[in-house]
Amino acid sequence: GLEEIWMKVFAEKLPDGSKAMAEALFEEKVNDIVHKEAIEKDRRPDGRKLDEIRELSGVAGGVSKVLHGSGIFFRGATHVLSVLTLGNPKDCQMLDGMELRGKKYFMHHYNFPPFSTGETGRMGATNRRSIGHGALAEKALRGILPNRESFPYTISFVSESMASNGSTSMASVCASSIAMMDGGVPIKRPAAGIAMGLMLSGAKSTSGRSEEAPYKILTDIQGPEDHHGDMDFKVAGT
């Protein structure tokens, strides 16, 4: 790719130069180009309009007859499988902490294995990111659940990121919503989520605060926009 060509040219022109500096210069230039194209020309890395969403598709069930419910959701190259398990009220999670005690009848677990980004890393313990993403999707889904009087079962989800190119947490909301419909959970309405991004252009003032500057908001950000963008925020609803 371009980075390999740049590193080769850099090594030829400056054989005693720092490799880390070359990588930093390349990253800075790409960052400037991504910002300039978005802010001045409304152009994104994959050619989409600023408010254009990638191709969507979803499948309810079809994974295994043994599962209580499942949903697969695709948004571009982001693919998430969500598996639903229903249990009796006694299967709830018992909360016994310093500040919180009670029972939890709805749980959502999120996994982000290395293969979802084409890596062969070790499958370790759940990290802080996975816990946070799982909690984020859980909060988004909690509002569409039926009341316990009409549906007293314990509801448990595991959302597995199969491929990642932006916002697997919000794709988990979509896949879990599909899984609940597949499993016969009488949800109030289907829920969906998406990631928004911000591209900001502006020099720093002497006070250290950013002066008013042009900005653009992107809908459905993917990997490069998430990496080079200045801010991202997740939105979920019905």
Model-inferred region functions:
Residues 65-75, 161-175:
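Glycine/serine-rich anion-binding loops at beta->alpha junctions
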Residues 121-127, 159-167:
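A short glycine/serine-rich beta->alpha loop
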Residues 2-5, 23-28, 49-55, 154-162, ...:
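A glycine-rich phosphate-binding loop feature that marks nucleotide/adenosyl-phosphate handling sites
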Residues 60-63, 70-72, 94-98, 143-147, ...:
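A generic local secondary-structure boundary/capping motif
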Residues 29, 136, 140, 144, ...:
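Stable alpha-helical structural segments in soluble proteins, enriched in small hydrophobic residues
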Residues 1-101:
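Extended amphipathic alpha-helical scaffolds
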Residues 180-202, 208-238:
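Mobile "lid/hinge" segments at catalytic clefts and subdomain interfaces of large enzymes
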Residues 68-153:
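Glycine-rich, flexible beta-strand/loop modules in the N-terminal catalytic cores of phosphate-handling
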